[in-house]
Every structure is written in C-alpha cells, then in structure tokens.
C-alpha cells in the first residue's frame, strides 16, 4: 500500500479496507527509518491512524493541519510525498524532523515548541473568514501540551469568536486521566453516536430560531443536563468554555475516527475531538518505554538499544549528580522542571527528595513565577529548563525574579548548538536575553567539573543566577585548571602577550585547539576562560589592556547582545586602543545538522576562528 502514496491526497485512492495494512506498513517504515537516522519515534507511532483519518476527511493543501510541537508529523510527511526525505531525516541539508513550510505547502506552520497550535490555527480561521474563503482548519494538540497556559488562552478566544474550527486532542494518557466506569462508557458512546450528535445540532439550530425564548431554552437545557455529565465526562470542561466536545474515540480505530471527524465538520463553531492514542504502538520497546523513544538516536531494532556508545557523563548527568549531592547538604534546595524530568536530569533528585521536586507541566512562565514565590518563602529553587524553552519566560525572569533580586537559580540546559532538532531548539539566544536583565548573574562552565562548582557557588550566592551548559558529553579537559569560583572573576588559563582569546563555556574546548595552533605558528596568546558573562571581569580586561593589542571573544550565541558585544562596548569606552574581534553566530536561526558540521558552516570551528584572526590581523 505504501508504494501508492507519492503525493498529497493519494490516500483518497486507498480503499478503507486497506487502511489497516497501510498503517502497519507506515509503522514498519518509521521504525526502520528512525532506527537508522534517529528522531522522534514513540509519538509518531501513536498517531498513524489519527493522521490517516485526518488526511482522508480533509483536502490538503487547501485544508490546513496545524501540528502542536510538530515532532509527531512523520506520517503527515509520508502522506504528503516525502518518503524519500527520511533517508536524511534531521541531517544537514536533509528533511527536518518538524513541519517546515519551505518543505511542502501541506505544512502550514513551522513548529517545534508546545501549546501554540490552537492560537496559530485560530489565526488561520479568522483570516479565512475575513477573506471570505472556504477551507477547514484543524489543530492537533497533545494532552501534555494542554498543561501550557497558552493553549487555554487560545481555547477561551476560540469559544468567544464562535467560528468553525476543529481541535483534535491527541490524548496518549500523558496528562489527562482516562475515563472509567460503565456510565462514562455509555455516555461517551451516546455522545459520539451519529444520531445523537445530529439530533443535538438540529434541535439547537431549531430552538435558536424561536423568537425571544429560543436561546434561553437552549441555555436552560445545557445547564440542566450538565449536573451529571460534569461529574463523568471530561469534555464538560470544554463545553462550559463554549466549545462543542466530541469523544473520546479510539485513536487506532479508523472507522470511528473518520465518523467523528466528519461529524466535527458539521458542527457550527469550535469543536474539540478527543482521541485516545497509545505512544509507541506497534513497537514493543517504544510502547513499554515511550520516554526513551521520544527523541532517540540510531538504535538496534531487535533490542531497542542505542547504537551510539556513551563516551562519558553528559553535562546533564553532571548537573543531575550535583543536584542530589547539594540536596543532601541543604534541605532548602528544591528543583523545578517544566515536564522535562528526564531531559533535564532531575529524575534522580526526585527519587532522592520526592517532596522537593516540582514538575509544573509545560508551563515555563508559571515555573519561573512559582520559583519566585518559593524563594520568597525561604527555599532555594533551581529551575532546570532547556535554553530555547526558557525564552517563553523572559518577562517572568525580568519582572518577578530580577526586579525583586530573588535567589532563584536557572540551570539552562541545551545552551548553544543542539544539532538535529534544528532552529526551534538551538540555544543561541540565552546570553543575549539574560545579560540585559538587571541583577542577573550569568555563568558558563568550561567542563563538567566547573559546572559542579558553579552550581555549588550559585546555591550559596545571593540574587538570581543563571548557568548555561550544552547538550552532550561533558568536556573533561583542562581539569588541571581548577581555581575557586569567585563572583565576576574569569580564569586565566595561559598568560601570553599581544592577543587575548576570551572564550565562553563549551567554546573553551574549541579555543584550546586554536591556542595550540597559534603557538605552533610562533605566537603566544593569552587564553581566558570567561566563566562569568555577567558581570564582566573588568579588572582583568583593564589588566590585559596594558600589554595586548587584540581581544578575540568566542561564544556559541548570537552576536547581538552577546558576550563579545559587551566586551567590545567596555573596551571602546575604557580602552579604545585595544581592538576587539567578536566571534559568534550572526543574527540568524541555525538549521538542523551535526554540531561539528554546523560550527564549520557558521564560522565557529577551530580552523574558522584561526582564519578569522589571521584575516583581521592582515586588515589591520
């Protein structure tokens, strides 16, 4: 069956009786493909039938599907003619692991972050209505994403606007409790029955046409029927908001879903279709351990084991172990995660101190303000969040934490380049938004040992502290340089003359190679591990200005607002005779690919840095 799918809407040529076979073939294709390239597997195995049903009742690309997060859109990509793209999934120059409008006109919204699909879909809907156009808009959102407040803001707005809009709730039992009990099953079956749904719609239309009293009668009916159902049907939450609720329906039963989706197309106004799916369906390792197959590297299909050999502890591992150690020493230390206990390394802290770990769901804004309250209450909160996700909480960091000078620690994982997940996940902006915040201290470790020391320093410090560290194996080099962490002080690794190389965090590993090459060429550069991006070590800058002509700053962050710009501004004001060469990421989004390859592409590899220094010196 799968060989018949080569372009959008080829699915309409497949007989309904053949859909189960097609679903099986798609699952096998996904397992084989992702085992070679890595990617998001469990979530995609769970939505095969759901995606088939949607594509069968819609007319793409005229109709629009907006995927929340987008990591579950692999079947959608297959059905829109991109099977061949899976050979280079998430590779440089290859197909993205997320929806990309530049890839296909069937991809309606570039995705990667959570809880925004209803907002984006509603925007499409209103534009459609304003322009007098006629197409369907479907937003697909997971139950986990409904823990994000933005989703409820959009639901509230959708209910107010009362325009035709379908929202598919993909419930894989991550956040919403399953419906249980005989009465619940009966009422759910009744509610999904075609006759009942049709009768409800027709009766409502008819009554509303009755002058003066019609609308009041409908409202009264809704109030009187809700008392029992409100206790049993989870959909009453949505009904009370003003949305029509349909479901729940088995997300692996094609006929039931297509029937319900067609009913949803008849509903006037916004409608929620509740679909129950199972993550990892069709592949036992992913079904039993969906977290391990959320985002996976290449793996052995027979065993489910990763093919890559772990070279050593990751920065996340180092943070995880340090949190447990510090938690034993200080009973006031608590951890906060936004639905990422595994990803941020806080699972071990939870096991050691179950009452001191708070998982707030996909709610970064709430996480930060919650941390502010905890700090005011007398504890020391550590907010562990990926760099690209923390962007959502900039206002809360600035207003709720920094303005009050609260002792909140931000453990910012996945800072800098992350590789295969691409633009939406690269952590290239945090130094820029962190350093603009008054009272914020910003640190970046050169290796795993320094991350431990910085976390310990932050626990005993005062005011807001941010530590940004990258994805991947923690660097174990330069461990002979292990001076104490002192507030606002950098670490001089090698003292030379004329040229000073100032590196931030992970780029210290790269700059170590640069220094060796410069020495091989007869130069004697000074090599500085910045440690603190804010405050700058102006005392050291003043000292180096006495016998150096060039400062070269290197960071894995956008140049705008980064470490290099701050150093350049200070030197221009205080030591204009010293030239500053900031080496950073130009103001752009960095696509997916291997980190080493991306560095070479954007000018952050050791050879690129050497070339930049030589070119700059020649120009002068």
What are these regions (language model features)?
Residues 259-262, 294-295, 304, 314-329, ...:
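Glycine-/acidic-rich phosphate or pyrophosphate-binding loops and their flanking alpha/beta elements
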Residues 40-161, 315, 332-333, 337-338, ...:
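Cofactor-binding active-site loop characterized by glycine-rich and histidine/acidic residues
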Residues 217-285, 407-412, 431-480, 606-620:
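Structural signature of the thiamine diphosphate
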Residues 173-319:
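Long, well-ordered, tryptophan-enriched scaffold segments
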Residues 38-47, 66-71, 99-118, 141-145, ...:
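Active-site nucleophile and cofactor-binding loops and adjacent substrate-binding regions
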Residues 1-79, 243-258, 274-277:
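N-terminal amphipathic, basic-rich helices that act as targeting or association modules
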Residues 298-302, 306-311, 419-421, 441, ...:
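Peripheral docking tails and interdomain loops at the edges
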Residues 64, 269, 277-391, 396-406, ...:
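Non-catalytic terminal/interface segments that mediate subunit docking, oligomerization
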């Amino acid at each position: 069956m799968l060989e018949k799918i080569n372009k959008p809407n080829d699915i309409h040529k497949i007989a309904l009786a053949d859909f189960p076979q097609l679903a099986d073939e798609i699952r096998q294709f996904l397992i084989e493909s992702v085992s070679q390239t890595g990617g998001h597997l469990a979530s995609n195995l769970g939505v095969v039938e759901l995606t088939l049903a949607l594509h069968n009742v819609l007319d793409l690309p005229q109709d629009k599907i907006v995927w929340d997060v987008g990591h579950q859109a692999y079947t959608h990509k297959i059905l829109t003619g991109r099977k061949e793209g899976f050979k280079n999934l998430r590779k440089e120059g290859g197909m993205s692991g997320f929806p990309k409008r530049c890839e296909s006109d069937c991809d309606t919204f570039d995705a990667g972050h959570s809880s925004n699909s209803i907002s984006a879909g509603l925007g499409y809907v209103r534009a459609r209505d304003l322009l007098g156009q006629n197409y369907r808009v479907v937003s697909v959102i997971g139950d986990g994403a409904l823990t994000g407040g933005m989703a409820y803001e959009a639901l509230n707005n959708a209910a107010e606007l009362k325009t035709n809009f379908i929202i598919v709730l993909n419930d894989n039992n991550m956040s919403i409790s399953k419906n249980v009990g005989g009465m619940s099953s009966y009422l759910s079956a009744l509610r999904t029955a075609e006759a009942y749904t049709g009768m409800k719609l027709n009766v409502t239309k008819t009554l509303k046409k009755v002058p003066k009293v019609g609308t009041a009668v409908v409202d009264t009916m809704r109030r009187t029927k809700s008392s029992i159902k409100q206790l049993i049907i989870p959909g009453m939450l949505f009904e009370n908001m003003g949305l029509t609720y349909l479901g729940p329906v088995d997300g692996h039963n094609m006929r039931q879903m297509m029937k319900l989706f067609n009913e949803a197309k008849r509903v006037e106004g916004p409608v929620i279709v509740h679909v129950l799916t199972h993550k990892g369906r069709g592949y036992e390792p992913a079904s039993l351990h969906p977290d391990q197959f959320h985002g996976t590297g290449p793996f052995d299909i027979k065993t489910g084991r990763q093919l890559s050999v772990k070279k050593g502890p990751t920065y996340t591992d180092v943070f995880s172990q340090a949190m447990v150690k510090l938690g034993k020493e200080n009973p006031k230390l608590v951890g906060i995660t936004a639905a990422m206990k595994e990803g941020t390394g806080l699972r071990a802290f939870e096991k050691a101190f179950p009452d001191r770990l708070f998982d707030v769901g996909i709610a970064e804004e709430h996480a930060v303000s919650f941390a502010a309250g905890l700090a005011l209450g007398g504890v020391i909160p550590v907010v562990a969040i990926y760099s690209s996700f923390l962007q959502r909480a900039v206002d809360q960091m600035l207003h709720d934490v920094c303005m009050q000078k609260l002792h909140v620690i931000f453990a910012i994982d996945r800072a800098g380049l992350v590789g295969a997940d691409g633009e939406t996940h690269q952590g290239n902006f945090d130094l820029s938004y962190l350093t603009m915040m008054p009272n914020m201290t910003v640190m970046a470790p050169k290796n795993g040992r320094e991350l431990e020391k910085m976390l310990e320093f932050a626990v005993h410090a005062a005011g807001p502290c941010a530590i940004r560290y990258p994805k991947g194996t923690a660097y174990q080099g330069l461990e002979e340089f292990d001076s104490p962490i002192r507030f606002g002080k950098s670490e001089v690794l090698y003292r030379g003359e004329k040229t000073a190389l100032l590196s931030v965090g992970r780029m210290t590993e790269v700059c170590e190679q640069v220094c060796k090459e410069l020495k091989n060429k007869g130069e004697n550069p000074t090599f500085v591990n910045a440690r603190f991006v804010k405050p700058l070590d102006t005392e050291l800058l003043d000292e180096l200005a006495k016998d150096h002509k060039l400062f070269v700053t290197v960071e894995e962050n956008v140049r705008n607002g980064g470490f290099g710009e701050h150093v350049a501004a200070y030197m221009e004001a205080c030591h204009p005779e010293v030239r500053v060469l900031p080496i950073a990421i130009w103001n752009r989004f960095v696509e997916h690919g291997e980190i080493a390859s991306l560095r070479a592409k954007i000018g952050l590899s050791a050879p690129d840095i050497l070339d930049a220094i030589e070119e700059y010196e020649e120009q002068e």
